Amino acid sequence: VMSKRYLRELVEKNIVDGWDDPRMPTLSGLRRRGYTPTSIFKFVKDAGISKADNLVDMRQLEAVLRAELELNAQRRVAVLDPVKLIIDNYPADQCEYFDLPNNPNRDANDSTTRKVAFTKELWIEKEDFAEVPPPKFKRLTLGSEVRLMGAYLVRCTGVDKDENGKVVAIHAEADLETRNGNPADGRKVRGTIHWVSCAHCLDAEVELYDKLFTESNMNSIPAVSYTHLRAHETLRHLV
C-alpha cells in the first residue's frame, strides 16, 4: 500500500503508531526499521522506472538491505526467548572470554573481534532445544551434541522441569578440549547454537515487526475493507 489516503487511515485509526511506524512503507518508517539510504537507492535503481502500475515484492527490498548489512554490519548476539543451559562440568566461579569475529563474512575484510564471556550458566533460545525433536533437527536434544557458537562442544545430559512439566533448565557437559576447534577424535557435530552468559548479558527491550497485511496486493481489496489487516499480530514486544 503506497496510497497516502490509505496510509493516513491506518494512522488515524491507530492501526499503526504513526507515519514512522516501522511497518509503514514511508521513508521515516523504513529508516526506523533499519533501512539505509544506499539500500533504498539501490532498490529503486534495480526496480527501474515504468509508466504502468507495477507490483514489486517487498522481499526484493529486504534482499538488497540484507546484502549490504552482510558486509557492513557488526554482529552481536541476542537470546529473545531464553531457557537456561547449565554446564555441569564447568566451575561455578570461572569465567573465560572467547574472541568472536565482528563480521565473519570473508568478503567484509573485517578482522576485528570482540570478547564474549563464557560461564557455567548460559541462556540459549528455547527453540534450540527439543525433548522430542522433529525430523532433521540439528540443534540440542537429550543425548545429542552441538557447538556453542565460538566456544565448546556440549552434550545434553538432562533437564529440570516445573510442576507443569515445562522445561526450566537444561543440563549439559562440555568437551573442554574443543575450545580451539574440532574434537581430537574427529567426530562430527551437526549443529551450532548461539548463547549469552547469564552473569554478563544485558537486559534489552526488543520489538519484532512483521508485514502489516496478509495480502500481497492490497489494491485488489476495497478501500473500506480492512478485514485482511493483522496489525495486532505484526508487533511482538519482548523484554
Positions of PLM-derived features:
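Active-site-proximal acidic segments at structured loop/helix or strand boundaries
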Residues: 41, 50-140
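C-terminal, non-catalytic macromolecule-binding modules
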Residues: 152-226
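Hydrophobic alpha-helix feature that most strongly marks membrane-spanning transmembrane helices
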Residues: 35, 45-48, 66, 161-164, ...
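Conserved small/polar residues in nucleotide/adenosyl-binding loops
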Residues: 227-234
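N-terminal non-catalytic structural scaffold regions of very large proteins
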Residues: 145-148
